[in-house]
Amino acid sequence: MFDDKLSKDLLLSARANNNLAVIRILQDTTSAINPNLQDENGKTALHWAVINLNPLITCYILKIEKVNVNIQDNTGFTVLHYLAKTISNLKFTTINGSFYKSNNYSILKTLFEYGIDVNIQDNKGNTALHYAICKNNFFFIEELLSNNASPFILNKAGFSILYKLNTKNCNFKDEIIESLHSKYPESIELGLVDNKIIIYDIHKLLYNLPYFMYEHNILILGNDA
């Protein structure tokens, strides 16, 4: 039986980014706490820990029995969607001349350890990979692809990350394409256009073809029409 007050206190403390309060709540017992309690926006304590880029609170919450890392809020976002939308593109940060793992990188690696589903789609059909591409977050893209994120998933507008890759001002386009080619050598053939590798998806106006392409892992390459 869960203690509603303790569960709510954990949620509010995580939202307030209050390390001491979270530790105090969890120091004696976690069996009475429901870590999956959601607020009015559908967010859990884990959502707030990740939104606040707080690796300490994230780790404490993940150690609670029966915590669900894949809960979606009212927008369909999992914690991974929020992490993908962070602007940091650094694996490491410098403090007093020493290198440390950045908070978002530490949290990402921890979430992978707890088996988070990298291909969950939000209410618009976007995965974490869609948002990572939009944010030019290269290290995040690399980590997602290394943990079985699919580049072939279409959002509700009919676009995969490959279309976004070619329409966004992506600073790491060549590197991302190289990663995709190494992981999906049979599905992706690279073409040279104006001395740069360009890869793109079919347009959303061709309603039936994107789904056929998704089913058969087919990609179209060349000059964007």
From Swiss-Prot:
PROSITE patterns named among the record's database cross-references: ANK_REP_REGION, ANK_REPEAT
InterPro entries in the cross-refs: Ankyrin_rpt, Ankyrin_rpt-contain_sf
Keyword field: ANK repeat, Repeat
Intervals holding ANK repeats: 6-35, 41-71, 75-120, 124-153
Matches recorded under SMART domains: ANK
Keyword Repeat applies: yes
Source organism superkingdom: Bacteria
Matching PANTHER family: ANKYRIN REPEAT AND PROTEIN KINASE DOMAIN-CONTAINING PROTEIN, ANKYRIN REPEAT-CONTAINING PROTEIN-RELATED
Protein known as: Putative ankyrin repeat protein RBE_1025
Species annotation: Rickettsia bellii (strain RML369-C)
